[in-house]
Curated annotation (Swiss-Prot):
Keywords: Cytoplasm, Nucleus, Phosphoprotein, Proteasome
PTM comment, free text: Phosphorylated in G2 phase.
UniProt name for this protein: Proteasome subunit alpha type-7-B
Main location: cytoplasm
A cellular component term, taken from the record's GO annotations: nucleus
Gene symbol of the encoding locus: psma7-b
Length: 247
């Protein structure tokens, strides 16, 4: 029997191959990074170069689900569109029913459940996306969650998905500290530094979105990103000079 063709059948050694193939599709996607600060949540994604005549605004990897929640994804854009639309409808339905916005965990659990159903149904295939979902609950607590094609989800302080996830995660494990997220600017810089581990062409290929407590989602413009990149480069040079003086 061909176990890699059947979605709902386990192989003898316990694998669901279609789910594993979906996870491989995620690893080929653009890198996305999320960091939860003290008063801010930040998502950054690696922008792939677009065709000369293509409108850049139509190529978005970060999108709002509700006023207090937004997400970034890695993997198949068409699959992400379905998940995003379903999640937005659920956010609206929740608001109409209970007259309150969703919590970040609620909508993450909804997305994870949707993905899980597609690993157990005939005539369907798993969604080839992982998502970083961030936002604030009504009490002002910042949240960051990650879901994968199998339907699992976990809360994180900082995480990365996509093709450069391994090296970015190693960077975050090394550099994420309470001091590194002490201010909003430091949190934003941490995300940019993490992305610069895999993005070769500097700030022009980075897309960044921030949400502060009780404030709407803000997409940073290229000039703001370049300013942060310039500050990071300056700090690097100063640190190198200090090292040289010590030696």
């Amino acid at each position: 029997m061909s176990y890699d063709r059947a979605i709902t059948v386990f192989s003898p050694d316990g694998h669901l191959f279609q789910v594993e193939y979906a996870q491989e599709a995620v690893k080929k996607g653009s890198t996305a990074v999320g960091v939860r600060g003290k008063e801010i949540v930040v998502l950054g994604v690696e922008k792939k170069s677009v065709a000369k005549l293509q409108d850049e605004r139509t190529v978005r990897k970060i999108c709002a689900l509700d006023e207090n929640v937004f997400m970034a994804f890695a993997g198949l854009t068409a699959d992400a569109r379905i998940v995003i639309n379903r999640a937005r409808v659920e956010c609206q339905s929740h608001r109409l029913t209970v007259e309150d916005p969703v919590t970040v965990e609620y909508i993450t659990r909804y997305i994870a459940s949707l993905k899980q159903r597609y690993t157990q149904s005939n005539g369907r295939r798993p969604f080839g996306i992982s998502a970083l979902i961030v936002g604030f609950d009504f009490d002002g607590t910042p949240r960051l969650y990650q879901t994968d094609p199998s339907g699992t989800y976990h809360a994180w302080k900082a995480n990365a998905i996509g093709r450069g996830a391994k090296s970015v995660r190693e960077f975050l494990e090394k550099h994420y500290t309470d001091e590194a997220i002490e201010t909003d600017d430091l949190t934003i810089k941490l995300v940019i530094k993490a992305l610069l581990e895999v993005v070769q062409s500097g700030g022009k290929n980075i897309e960044l979105a921030v949400m502060r407590r009780d404030q709407p989602l803000k997409i940073l413009n290229p000039e703001e990103i370049e300013r942060y990149v310039a500050e990071i480069e300056k700090e690097k040079e100063e640190n190198e000079k200090k090292k040289q003086k010590k030696t």
